[in-house]
Amino acid sequence: MKELTLKYGCNPNQKPSKIFMEEGQLPLEVLNGRPGYINFLDALNAWQLVKELQDATGWPAAASFKHVSPAGAAIGLPLTDTLKKIYFVDDFDEPLSPIACAYARARGADRMCSYGDFVALSTTCDLQTALLLKREVSDGVIAPSYTPEALAVLREKRKGTYNVIQIDPTYVPAPIEHKQVFGITFEQGRNEVHLTDDALFADVPTRNKTFTPEAKRDLIIALITLKYTQSNSVCYVKDGQAIGIGAGQQSRIHCTRLAGSKADTWWLRQCPKVMNLPFKEGIRRADRDNTIDVYIRDDHDDVLRDGVWQQFFTEKPAILTREEKRDWIAQNTNVALGSDAFFPFGDNIERAHKSSVQYIAQAGGSIRDDNVIETCDKYDIAMAFTHVRLFHH
């Protein structure tokens, strides 16, 4: 098949719409549903990300995409009991497969932003992963293959309309890519930079020059994630998964703040006071996610005031105070941070430190590099200048 007609483009008024190949066949097949224009943008960006993550780490990988940026990305490291609980996957009797773990991590890191996502899997979608996908609100999934049992489950999702795409994992695109804006064609070489080389960590200007193997792995995950995130972007990673992604901000510090806030929320969800919230039986996942998100923030009264808390809880929870939140966040350790371009000022490092960042990889090259290095040294943070910019538009 050389082309696939779509219902419409970005918006319903943008017709006609299609995806096509000028030469050869499309390297994908729609196994179920009718994916749209934005679905394919998400699917193809997400597929590149997870394929590159698996190639770089040797682990199956998954990503959760919304509006052409990842809400989450992860490799399939085993889940702790705490993560199983906050990701709502603690009801499986058998240990989760690596690809199911990767999906649970990618989907669970930022559940608010992953609502209605498009998912990418780097390897075969098995039955466990399909069962996890089935119970989440999602637009579709792309993977190189599906077990028959998994495909049967996914074909039942969303009254049979769930989008399932199979992609040829051996497909390699042309080295030159094109796009049109306002009738004008842009051409550039594909971004083929490889983010696995030890050269990424060869230039370490900070006093602390120690990167553990786990830190290097997490920084590589951060950089690969940023390679497929709308710029400007910053990514916090811990234990093989993105825990906070700040995408599409015009200011670097706003990226760092946004991603840091998401990372803090991820960590606060593991606080015993949050994990033991007395939710009513039968509350929907989306309502639980929204309620936890508000409870953690300073506007917690939106779910705790009289006449409201009764909708969600069996008894009124105590407030999670600012002091409790600060103390809990301080217990986080060994967070890695990547940036798609240089940090212009040390304020980014100050904000990163508040979210327990210990390792940083960024391009370097700011006229204020000295200020950034000095701020890292102030907190004994190890920072590498990669000399690689990762803008994505």
Question: At which residue positions do the language-model features occur?
Answer:
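C-terminal binding/interaction regions
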Residues: D117, L121-S122, R135-I165, T170-V172, ...
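Flexible, glycine/charged-enriched surface loops at secondary-structure junctions
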Residues: A56-S64, V164-I167, S231-K238, L268-F279, ...
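Gly-rich Lys/Arg/Thr-decorated short loops/hinges at beta-loop-alpha junctions or inter-strand turns
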Residues: E22-R34, A109-Y115, Q188-K209, A286-V308, ...
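Conserved helix-loop functional segments at active or binding sites
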Residues: E52, Y228, T265-R269, K354
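Bateman/CBS regulatory modules and CBS-like beta-alpha motifs in cytosolic regions of diverse proteins
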Residues: T124, D203-E214, F343
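Active-site-proximal loop/turn and secondary-structure-junction residues that shape catalytic pockets
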Residues: S69, C125, K238-Q241, F343, ...
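Glycine- and Gly-Pro-enriched alpha-helical subdomains that act as flexible
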Residues: A71-M112, I243-F342
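Active-site loops and adjacent core secondary-structure elements that bind or stabilize anionic groups
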Residues: M1-D197, A215-S233
